[in-house]
Regions:
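Extreme N-terminal leader/targeting segments of oxidoreductases
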Residues: 1-22, 36-40
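C-terminal helical "tail/cap" subdomain of flavin- and related membrane-associated enzymes
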Residues: 2-4, 12-14, 104, 345-480, ...
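Core beta-strand elements of the Rossmann-like FAD/NAD(P) dinucleotide-binding domain
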Residues: 17-19, 170-180
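Conserved mid-domain beta->alpha element of the FAD-binding
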Residues: 26-35, 39, 133, 183, ...
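Glycine-rich FAD pyrophosphate-binding loop
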Residues: 36-59
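Active-site-adjacent segment of FAD-dependent monooxygenases/related oxidoreductases
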Residues: 55-138, 157, 231, 240-241, ...
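Conserved FAD-binding catalytic core of PHBH/FMO-like flavoproteins
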Residues: 135, 142, 159-161, 180, ...
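A conserved short coil-to-beta-strand element within the FAD-binding core of flavoproteins
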Residues: 146-161
Length: 607
């Protein structure tokens, strides 16, 4: 159906001429940012120069961490229902002496190396991801402004920007007043040009690839696995199963150190023929072709992801570009935005100091550089054959999955003073099984609490009855209006003035269960005590009011802390994006030291 008929993904009426955040680009990165800002109750306008969302092709692979993120956002179900899943990878190779043959097969995300809750790649074209995020935004009253090409940005006063864009449907220039501008507008980002000294650094290689999405007719036996093919005469191919019985082929047209194939020559027919030569003696024909693309591999990172005033930012491909061979682009891009959204929310609301925004560049530029370093080695391994590629996968599989994307010590990731716990600051919280005390439901600790831009303060209490005095003292101190209680009061006032952006679906999530104590902190307790060992009424008021986040442990304590003694309490501070901010253990007589440690972590918050 034509966009003009069903209006899907369109702005209704004129965009507002003043907002808080303008996002340029409605691909996965821009939509992830705008969607989260809308959820947090922040006014946002999202501009896109296309008339509609992506219909076919482009990014297609969701890694385990991205699947987890969509589950945390309660948006994963349509993708889990309709996308293809890949659990394994096989390696094929030919030599001058032997025809094409399978040389190895392995689990894509081994439990002992990755430990992901969803140990597979989820395959669906980019438009399916965009549609889910668009639908969620629209349910909260935010619509993409289409046919809107970003033109320029200027500063009109302290903290005031004027964003100009071209309305392509009327050929007129329109302006929006905003406090922040975020460019999610791709590798040729125009927003990036308004950030001083932010040009891309790195290499444009000679490696070029053709990409085909379609339904294939073949006698190749591993059609429904991820397959890396290396031939001695016709380069490499990467096979990826897709939704609706399709397969994506990445077909190598020229190597990194070879002569680049002219883009005009790299037609659909040329790429098909190249693939047929590589797959000989197997039959390879296309029943349909839904999408075709080709690209030259560039491996570059922007020198800066934000301007000195922390008013203009870039995310996604605007900040980094690389090959598509490891399905990292959309995954990394969406997590750029996921990182930025909660920080913007806290600063805009006056709940955190503006310096918090500097951690966006520190953290996400590190991940971008880690990605490029991996991608360089990954592309080399593809050219070297099965043994090198298998080694590269094993060495980097945690990073590829997203689980191993780790941040350095800094404002938000406080060193644990040599504490040797399985979970460390700067790492994603580890999956763990627990049972909710209040209703006896078994849940995943990393998924159960909805994303409401709250820090989660987990108290791991091996034995509740012997720890009641510790819990009472700590809870009273945390609720004190001279400490975290004061920050909670400020957050409550902010969210009364500008509430969360709720949708009808939130009625079933019941976010009010998690904001009873605070809009900015969620307090949770995980215990190895039996349900019959204590009543909620035995707990201090702070934890009584947190009844939906009281958990009976299955394996979370061991996964996060290892062994905790009965006379110890473990505390883990988890950031709104699921990363561990700090972790520590104390004796039952150290409630005051525990409180000071928690308050010291939150020094970046406004009093």
């Amino acid at each position: 159906m034509a966009p003009g008929i069903d209006h899907e993904g369109y702005s209704f009426g004129e965009p507002v001429n003043a907002t808080t955040v303008v996002v340029v680009g409605a691909g996965p990165s821009g939509l992830m940012l705008a969607c989260n800002l809308a959820r947090f109750g922040i006014d946002v306008v999202i501009l896109d120069d296309r008339p509609d969302k992506t219909s076919t092709g482009k990014a297609d692979g969701m890694q385990p961490k991205t699947i987890e993120t969509f589950k945390q956002m309660r948006l994963a179900e349509p993708l889990l229902k309709n996308a293809a899943r890949v659990y394994d990878i096989s390696f094929w190779q030919s030599t001058a002496d032997e025809p094409l043959r399978r040389t190895g097969r392995q689990t894509h995300y081994p439990e002992h190396l990755v430990g992901a809750s969803d140990p597979y790649i989820l395959l669906a074209h980019q438009g399916m991801i965009e549609e889910i995020l668009i639908d969620d935004m629209e349910s909260r009253g935010v619509f993409v402004t289409r046919n809107a090409r970003f033109s320029s940005c200027s500063t009109t006063g302290p903290g005031q920007l004027e964003v100009a864009y071209e309305d392509l449907s009327t050929n007129t220039i329109k302006t929006i007043r905003a406090e922040y501008l975020v460019g999610c507008d791709g590798a040729r980002s125009k927003v990036r040009t308004f950030i001083p000294d932010a040009e891309l650094e790195g290499e444009m290689t000679n490696a070029s690839w053709g990409v085909l999405d379609g339904v294939i007719d073949t006698d190749f036996p591993d059609l429904w696995s991820k397959v890396a093919v290396r031939t001695h005469t016709a380069g490499s191919i990467l096979w990826i199963p897709r939704e609706r019985n399709m397969t994506r082929l990445y077909v190598e047209l020229s190597a990194t150190d070879g002569e680049r194939v002219d883009k005009a020559k790299a037609t659909t027919e040329y790429v098909m023929q190249r693939a047929k030569e590589a797959m000989h003696p197997f039959k390879l024909e296309w029943k349909t072709v839904e999408w075709f693309g080709n690209y030259v591999v560039g491996q570059r990172v922007a020198k800066h992801f934000m301007d000195p005033d922390a008013r203009i930012f870039i995310a996604g491909d605007a900040g980094h570009c690389h090959s598509a061979l490891a399905a990292q682009g959309a995954n990394t891009s969406m997590h750029d935005s996921f990182n930025l959204a909660w920080k913007l929310n806290l600063v805009i609301r006056g709940l955190a100091k503006p310096s918090l925004l500097s951690t966006y560049e520190e953290e996400r530029r590190k991940i971008a550089n880690d990605l490029i370093n991996f991608d360089v080695e990954h592309c080399k391994a593809f050219e070297q054959g099965e043994a090198a590629l298998a080694t590269n996968f094993n060495d980097n599989i945690r990073f590829i999955s997203g689980v191993g994307a780790e941040y350095s010590t800094g404002m938000l990731n406080r060193a644990s003073n040599g504490l040797s716990t399985p979970l460390q600051p700067g790492e994603l919280q580890l999956p763990g099984k627990v049972t909710r005390y209040v209703d006896a439901n078994p849940v995943d600790i990393q998924l159960d609490i909805p994303l409401l831009c709250q820090f989660r303060i987990y108290l791991f209490v091996p034995d509740v009855p012997s720890s009641l005095k510790f819990l009472a003292t700590l809870s009273e101190d945390l609720a004190n209006l001279n400490g975290l209680g004061k920050r909670s009061t400020g957050a409550k006032q902010s969210y009364i003035k500008k509430p969360l952006g709720l949708s009808p679906a939130d009625e079933f999530i019941s976010p009010q269960r998690y904001t009873t104590v605070s809009n900015v902190f969620t307090y949770a307790m995980v215990t190895q005590s039996a349900r019959s060992d204590f009543e909620i009424a035995d707990l201090p008021k702070l934890l009584q009011d947190s009844r939906w986040t009281l958990y009976l442990d299955t394996n979370a304590t061991e996964r996060w802390f290892g062994k905790l003694k009965k006379e110890q309490v473990g505390v883990a501070i988890v950031r709104p994006d699921g990363y561990c901010g700090s972790i520590g253990t104390w004796g039952l007589e150290e409630a005051d030291q525990t409180r000071r440690w928690i308050e010291e972590y939150f020094e970046f918050m406004q009093w």
